Design a protein with these regions (language model features):
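Conserved acetyl-CoA pyrophosphate-binding loop and the N-cap/start of the following alpha-helix
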Residues: 95-104
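Short amphipathic alpha-helix that is part of the acyltransferase structural core
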Residues: 3-47, 142
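Hydrophobic, well-ordered beta-alpha structural blocks that scaffold small-molecule cofactor pockets
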Residues: 103-110, 114
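A conserved beta-strand-loop-helix scaffold within acyl/acetyltransferase catalytic domains
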Residues: 50-90
């Protein structure tokens, strides 16, 4: 691979659900809103704003909008061939409870031009039931899963 110019880029995708719009258009992301939202989560509270900006630059960021105001976000880290990590799935608390979060996850996992991947992973402390609806399961062989935490 000569340079990052060879990086896979999917065509933009947009879909609607009532008054909500899901979009993969990077310019629509309200970065300030997303940073504030993620810093308030249990998984993002130890990040910095710069870490979040950098993570957005190196992944596929999806936005959820209600009348053009950002109310949700999801992010995919992938090689576009075999593996993807779903992360930073967040919906504004005022918008929860009306299936829009489930719809956003569905849109994120089923992007029209995303190749069929061998494996998707995610980490969640409290949303296992939501992700089971999309085929996620506890690891069949947890002894094969390892992780490393850098400080």
């Amino acid at each position: 691979m000569k340079d990052r110019a060879m990086q896979t880029v999917l065509p933009l995708h947009e879909a609607t659900f009532g008054e909500y719009t899901f979009s993969t258009e990077p310019s629509r992301i309200d970065t300030d809103w997303a940073i504030e939202a993620l810093l308030a989560t249990y998984w993002g509270k130890h990040r910095t704003a710069d870490m979040i900006r950098t993570s957005f630059e190196h992944s596929l960021v999806c936005g959820l909008y209600k009348r053009n105001r950002q109310v949700g976000i999801s992010r995919i880290i992938t090689d576009y061939a075999t593996f993807a990590y779903l992360c930073d799935v967040y919906v504004d608390p005022a918008e929860r409870g009306n299936k829009v979060g489930t719809w956003m996850v569905d849109q994120t996992l089923d992007l029209p031009h995303m190749p069929k991947l061998r494996r998707w992973v995610l980490f969640t402390q409290d949303a296992q039931d939501l992700y089971r609806k999309f085929g996620f399961e506890n690891p069949a062989y947890p002894e094969r899963v390892m992780e490393r935490h850098d400080t």
